[in-house]
Design a protein with these regions (language model features):
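Non-catalytic, structured segments within soluble enzyme domains
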Residues: 100-266, 399-414, 418-423, 437
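Soluble, non-transmembrane domains of envelope/secretory-pathway proteins that act on or interact
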Residues: 13-15, 20-21, 34, 214-238, ...
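Active-site loop and adjoining helix of the penicillin-binding protein/serine DD-peptidase-beta-lactamase fold
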Residues: 134, 138, 190-208, 252-264, ...
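Conserved catalytic neighborhood of penicillin-recognizing serine enzymes
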Residues: 93-118, 233-237, 243, 247, ...
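Active-site SXXK
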Residues: 67-70, 74, 268, 296-297, ...
Length: 688
């Protein structure tokens, strides 16, 4: 007896917890992600050992269920002080002690696990401990508090713990909506959680008769069979941000308030899904988008995919395509190697590399001739970008990208070569969006943040003046018209700056841009890296970008940035006039009134500009041969020059040549038949 007394004293101390403490320690198995206004965005299971929902108040539980539980488990609950002496005396002659356990005693065992025997039935020693603990609870708690806590902690069936988990898991409804039949089934499960559906329904019918519920037992049996035989599927209350929820809801973080805006998040996801449906026939299955506030870096929308995949495409590395060009030109202007009016030659180019000749092409497989930096970037021409990379240096460009947060650019410039200018490196949408946000913030960099719990510091990465010039180019419709036209999915009715990109073989498609207040980035493609069919940045990602920008600026204006002191605007003209005279932006000290180019070279200097000597051209097996063309180029373009391929005149160079596998000889002659230049090249592929 002395040992029992000491045991009871220890139990009493352990069970001496108030209602508020027990409720505060309670943790749902479901993590909840809230938006910036406190609206539930996503519910995600984070505890795989048990299934608990949110704590449920007694007022939110069906009265029928409360009556059924008290009748089944503790008929004199409101009359005793923790111990039902009548039930206890009645159980003395039986083998078990289960029938004498009051709700208070059962609750004590839930609060203090030491009162539950492991792997065996409770004996009188555990019963005695529970009795003492129950008396302590009754002294400090109200009856309603005891009942409420009990119904949130008791196990019903399998992993379902608490009335809300059981109600939603078995009947797909909140406990406030339980009818009499459902209440009887759940009440019986407390004592017999693993019983067969038939046994549960039999006991529920008996319980219903005792409560004088008008129960149809055959119907109850059918309902029980359906509920207990069906796999438990607890549908989340909200499922609008699965990828960010999986990132933020970890460990003990079961409730996180994010910076997302629920209305924008849901709209953004719907827009992306609609676009994926629209272009799905073109071998496009997935997409992602990110919306960020420029000033704070707070994430307003994070959609990691259009489907149910766990892959978060906001963070997944993919080839960048042309989206890195703004940062290449920004570096060249910052170092005063180029200006927005500098002239670049968009003509055939062959560069020696560690793997052989590097021969870049424009997206449209043609050449524009002499173009300014403004036109080159605005119209996303590839060859001028590669020429710029040769001036800037691959090492310097790779280092700048790392400064901007492109963590996957982790090798020196030689590894990437000049192809880095065309996006051969892998980047994530998250990194791209923040890099463009850095441009929007005039070169000030800080991480983007999905919660307000993170404190960030700004640091200057880009020169303010050069960033302003690049921003102005990306906002210039005329600059992009050479490739995209004046009216396209990049044109907004308010001020914005934007860049598209398409990676090799159309595997990735990007559109990233910003307004005065927001930066929006969109990616479309396939998680398995398979190529899309005839999908460009303008037709794939850009429509989503445009729709989101319009939504964001329904009532919010977007004004162009003010010119910094380090930049001036002046009139510039081009001689010869390959581009019209215009007002142009310069870093102070680099301005010029005229850009003069040498006159056309004499015929004596005529040469074949493309292909280069020893070039190897490859036929694409995925494109019908009749759709493929090789465009030869000579300088100067003169009617007195004749280009022959394998001894036969080619005629109109602008029509292109359908490639044929094998070695070929290209020769250039003047009007008298004199040989001016010759080039040998090879075509490799399956077609002959």
């Amino acid at each position: 007896m002395l040992l029992l007394g000491l045991s009871a004293l220890a139990v009493q101390v352990q069970a001496d917890s108030d209602f508020a403490s027990v409720r505060a320690r309670y943790q749902s198995s479901e993590g909840r992600l809230y938006d910036r206004h406190g609206e539930l965005l996503h519910e995600l299971r984070v505890n795989l050992k048990q299934r608990r929902m949110e704590w449920t108040r007694l007022d939110d539980i069906s009265p029928a269920f409360l009556s059924a539980v008290i009748r089944a488990e503790d008929q004199r609950f409101y009359d005793h002080a923790g111990i039902d002496w009548r039930a206890l005396l009645a159980s003395l002659g039986s083998e078990g002690t289960r029938g004498a356990s009051t709700l208070s005693m059962q609750l004590a065992a839930h609060i203090d696990p030491t009162l539950k025997p492991a792997g065996r039935r409770r004996g009188w020693s555990e019963k005695w401990g529970q009795m003492q603990a129950a008396r302590t609870l009754e002294k400090n708690w109200s009856k309603n508090e005891i009942l409420e806590a009990y119904l949130n902690l008791v196990t019903f069936r399998g992993e379902l713990q608490g009335v809300t988990a059981a109600s939603r898991g078995l009947f797909d409804k909140q406990p406030s909506g339980l009818d009499q039949t459902e209440s009887l089934v759940l009440a019986v499960l407390i004592r017999s959680p693993n019983a067969s559906p038939l046994r549960v329904s039999e006991r529920a019918c008996v319980l219903g008769a005792g409560l004088r519920f008008p129960v149809d037992c055959p119907s109850l049996t059918a309902r029980t069979e359906q509920a207990l035989r069906t796999a438990v599927r607890l549908r989340p209350h909200a499922a609008d941000a699965p990828h960010l929820a999986r990132r933020l809801l970890k460990g003990k973080q079961t409730s996180v308030t994010s910076t997302l805006d629920a209305r924008l998040q849901r709209y953004a996801r719907a827009v992306l899904v609609h676009q994926l449906d629209t272009i799905g026939a073109q071998r496009v299955s997935e997409g992602a988008l990110l919306v960020v506030d420029n000033a704070s870096g707070e994430v307003l929308a994070w959609v990691g995919g259009g489907g149910v995949s766990h892959v978060d495409a906001v963070r997944a590395p993919r080839q960048a395509g042309s989206t890195l060009k703004p940062f290449l030109y920004q570096l060249a202007i910052e170092k005063r190697l180029l200006t927005a009016a500098s002239v670049l030659d968009d003509s055939p180019l062959s560069l020696a590399s560690t793997t052989g000749l590097y021969v870049p092409h424009n997206y449209e497989r043609d050449f524009k001739g002499l173009v300014s930096v403004r036109t080159s970037l605005g119209s996303s021409l590839n060859i001028p970008a590669v020429r710029t990379a040769t001036v800037v240096g691959a090492d310097a460009f790779a280092a700048r990208l790392r400064e901007l947060g492109f963590q996957h650019v982790n090798r020196d410039g030689d590894y990437y070569g000049f192809a880095l200018a065309l996006g051969s490196a892998e980047v994530s949408l998250e990194q791209l969006v923040n890099a463009f946000r850095t441009l929007a913030n005039r070169g000030q960099y800080s991480p983007i943040v999905p919660t307000r719990a993170v404190s960030v510091q700004n640091r200057r990465v880009l020169d303010e003046g050069a960033s302003f010039v690049i921003t102005d180019i990306l906002a210039d419709r005329s600059a992009r018209s050479l490739t995209f036209g004046l009216e396209n999915a990049l044109a907004t009715p308010f001020w914005s700056a934007v860049k598209t990109g398409t990676s090799k073989d159309m595997r990735d498609n990007w559109c990233v841009g910003f307004s005065e207040r927001y930066t929006v980035g969109v990616w479309v493609g396939n998680f398995d890296g398979s190529p899309m069919q005839d999908v460009s940045g303008v037709t794939g990602a850009a429509p989503v970008w445009l729709e989101l920008m319009r939504f964001l600026h329904t009532r919010t204006p977007s004004r162009p940035p003010r010119t910094p002191a380090s930049v001036l605007e002046t009139e510039v003209q081009f001689t010869p006039a390959f581009e019209s005279a215009r007002r142009e932006l310069f870093l102070r000290g680099t301005e010029t009134a005229e850009v003069r180019m040498p006159t056309t070279p004499p015929l004596a200097q005529a040469r074949i500009r493309y292909p280069g000597r020893g070039s190897i051209l490859a036929i694409d097996p995925d494109i019908p041969i009749e759709m493929q063309r090789v465009f030869f180029d000579v300088a100067p373009r003169d009617a007195h020059l004749r280009l022959d391929l394998d001894g036969r005149p080619l005629g109109n160079l602008d029509a292109g040549w359908t490639p044929a596998a094998g070695t070929h000889q290209l020769t250039l002659h003047d009007a008298n038949g004199t040989l001016m230049d010759e080039v040998g090249f090879e075509v490799r592929g399956a077609y002959h």
